[in-house]
């Protein structure tokens, strides 16, 4: 009889500990921000990077009214190289293209891809996401630059003219680049769309880089307009970089507007 009582007490203690552990996780993470309940658990190891991490699940029904955020693009159709970095496909910009936000000018540096998307919208994942990365000037190695990243989501659909311009230029070998002739890849074929130039057509929030060192000095602008790319185009990029999306992170006290 004593063995039975001991076993019951041990079982109850185990259940209590499990319940407490689960409650701690729920206290830290809003599981509803994850597409799947277990996805929230991936956030735990990243807490050491801070509470303003990216990407996030953007809940459109909780979006605040825009408070006047506006970005101004001043870009040139000057992409100097296409790189196969192994973990992503990257296009490098020549100097001279900028984006301005709240009086700060950021220099276009590069754009790259994630398959599938890193950001979610109302729990929905998209097959691909493009990031256009801009930074403030690097003053010295001890200064952390500020970043402005434009996120563009893609769904499967018609062939994308901009992607077609460089897909065949991507080097086969990892960690190599291919120079781009002037005018061969036209950024205007991507950014001149009416939808992308509507200042009300994006989600904004403060966050981080989605790759090491996960720096938390990023102004994120994720466009609401979902662009199209053919399944073959998306598969071609995924075949090079694989599945390279970071798990979504807790939003904590931040808001999306």
Segments and roles (model prediction):
Residues 1-8:
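Bacterial N-terminal signal peptides that target proteins for export
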Residues 13-14:
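Residue-level signal for mature regions of secreted extracellular proteins and peptides
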Residues 21-257:
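Alpha-carbonic anhydrase
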